[in-house]
């Protein structure tokens, strides 16, 4: 599994995980938080924490 410092390759570019946020709400509030964080990082992606509708998210950022 990925952790802070893990190497990731996105579109041929090598980056390192720099921040992970757990339990992010899957709604407008969560979107605002993620949008603000994306402005500070080179890349970001999300995974659902549960296999259900409107699951909270884990959001990963890399630089």
Give the ranges of each region predicted by the language model.
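Extracytoplasmic/periplasmic soluble domains downstream of a signal peptide or transmembrane helix
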Residues: 1-63
């Amino acid at each position: 599994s990925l952790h802070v410092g893990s190497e990731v390759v996105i579109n041929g570019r090598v980056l390192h995980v720099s921040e992970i946020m757990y339990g992010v709400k899957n709604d407008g509030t969560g979107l605002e938080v993620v949008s603000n964080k994306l402005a500070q990082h080179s890349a970001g992606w999300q995974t659902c924490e549960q296999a259900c509708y409107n699951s909270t998210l884990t959001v990963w950022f890399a630089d």
